[in-house]
Design a protein with these regions (language model features):
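Active-site region of glycoside hydrolase catalytic domains
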Residues: 7-206
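Single conserved hydrophobic/aromatic residue that forms the stacking wall/gate
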Residues: 1-6, 204-212
Length: 212
């Protein structure tokens, strides 16, 4: 049978002009679009990917300005856009389970940063692990835990609250329950890894519980 990724990178320009992922209604726009796809194709599709690589279209498109729409937005806007993307995912999972014509398998895919140990020593391995999952203000839109924790653990990582502070998104009652709708699989795209050349600089990082 067919397998469907509902959303990868492109975004309708008419909706971009209305604020895009910053618009509070953006998650509902997405569900409306996804419903059209489900109504048309769910009789022949089992595996559904709601959203692919939000780190790419949010991080590269709105944080560092390398992809369309080539913007560099402040942390507060990036956090709210991320939250709306996650809401779109959760609402779409719920809609697919309610409306699909055949039993669906639903997931979400990330583009995951990865650091490789410089050698096989326990210290180098731990340094690489902590670098891979470190949460920083400058790179939070690319961090795995920022996207995965709300879906699998029902909340943003604790580091996010201490790092972003007042720039955390507006989280309404019921949002996290929607975002953390059960999924059937978890997609991971790892395109490359990098070795940590200065491990001493990361020895101060505390352990972080991750979903991986």
């Amino acid at each position: 049978g067919s397998e469907m990724c509902i959303r990868d990178r492109d975004y309708p320009y008419a909706l971009h002009q209305k604020g895009g992922w910053l618009n509070p209604d953006s998650s509902d726009w997405f569900v409306d679009y996804a419903k059209v796809v489900v109504d048309a194709l769910s009789d022949r599709v089992t595996y559904w990917m709601t959203i692919n690589e939000p780190q790419v279209f949010i991080g590269c498109g709105y944080a560092i300005g390398k992809f369309a729409p080539f913007q560099k937005l402040p942390a507060r806007d990036l956090a709210q856009m991320s939250h709306n993307v996650l809401l779109a995912h959760g609402k779409t999972v719920k809609m697919i389970r309610e409306c699909a014509k055949k039993a669906p398998k639903i997931g979400f895919a990330f583009s995951t940063p990865c650091t490789t140990p410089t050698d096989n020593s326990p210290l180098a391995i731990e340094i690489a692990r902590q670098k891979s999952f470190a949460f920083t203000r400058e790179r939070f839109a690319f961090e795995t835990a920022w996207w995965a924790d709300p879906i699998f653990l029902g909340d943003y990582p604790q580091d996010a609250y201490s790092v972003l502070k007042s720039d955390m998104p507006n989280i309404k009652e019921g949002d996290m329950e929607l975002i953390s709708q059960p999924v059937d699989f978890y997609g991971v795209n790892i395109y490359y890894s990098q070795a940590e050349e200065n491990p001493v600089s990361y020895t101060h990082l505390r352990a972080h519980e991750t979903v991986l």
